[in-house]
Amino acid sequence: MEANGLGPQGFPELKNDTFLRAAWGEETDYTPVWCMRQAGRYLPEFRETRAAQDFFSTCRSPEACCEPTLQPLRRFPLDAAIIFSDILVVPQALGMEVTMVPGKGPSFPEPLREEQDLECLRDPEVVASELDYVFQAITLTRQRLAGRVPLIGFAGAPWTLMTYMVEGGGSSTMAQAKRWLYQRPQASHQLLRILTDALVPYLVGQVAAGAQALQLFESHAGHLGPQLFSKFALPYIRDVAKQVKARLREAGLAPVPMIIFAKDGHFALEELAQAGYEVVGLDWTVAPKKARECVGKTVTLQGNLDPCALYASEEEIGQLVKQMLDDFGPHRYIANLGHGLYPDMDPEHVGAFVDAVHKHSRLLRQN
């Protein structure tokens, strides 16, 4: 630490590094915890912000992104913050129009329909400059955090981004995106490469701006079986990690732990553990002990309480957390949900989850 109390890049010195130490596989006094979508509509104060009304314009405002990022930390003793943004800012930066439709979610008025549509996408090298507003939000938020906890940056993985760009929004089947994989494999690989080439400088830029960890969301992994996943998702997941780490070294930036969260991708846990990430995120469909058997002791696991468990009583939440912690054990583990928080969840129950993790994980280490 410098004499003025500032760490590298002039940011305030980090006071709670429990999350980072767990991510790197080091011993911790308790199990760190954060929640996917911890900045969100379940908080009354979030619903009063501009983000609740005009989502993507909020994403483009560093000040407007900073506030919802900090809101959950004012309520709960979380061990990490995650920047308020969206995975779909990358397709936007590639030149696609994306709107947020109330009650429906993201919508692409002109999705990719033909191979020649790829020619309309911007050069992936310009994406990072188009997303400078995200970097500004990260720097501002890192300053405002004042070293309280680490700040996580994130992006969507190539396959997941491709699904939105081809489907035109969410889908229960991803039939159009998978149709591309079967009918246009070469064009699919071309699109996935474009996305990978856009993601790498974007993620490196987040670290340069102040992000202390990175999470890659492969939210639609479950729509691919083992064969399609190994062909169209896993190679690009690996390449993102490899290239980000190499570029950080080239830029003289310190390495940061990287997390891969492939929802419903339990069929590929062993491969994901060897994909170059320090942490593998789990959804609630995989048993902790089975997951540990698959990944071994070389990576940290993150997850994996069913988000709907937070609809239970606070007492039952405590029991479920205790069971989860017992199953994962105290080493190489970060507590989280198996997916994001839902808008109708009770903040008190989120607090009960966080408190239970801290309480039971300390007891676990005493025994």
Swiss-Prot record:
Transmembrane segments: none annotated. Its EC number is 4.1.1.37. One of its GO terms (molecular function) is uroporphyrinogen decarboxylase activity. One of its GO terms (cellular component) is cytosol. The keyword Transmembrane does not apply. CDD domains: URO-D. Homodimer. Belongs to the uroporphyrinogen decarboxylase family. Catalyzes the sequential decarboxylation of the four acetate side chains of uroporphyrinogen to form coproporphyrinogen and participates in the fifth step in the heme biosynthetic pathway. Isomer I or isomer III of uroporphyrinogen may serve as substrate, but only coproporphyrinogen III can ultimately be converted to heme. In vitro also decarboxylates pentacarboxylate porphyrinogen I. This is Uroporphyrinogen decarboxylase.
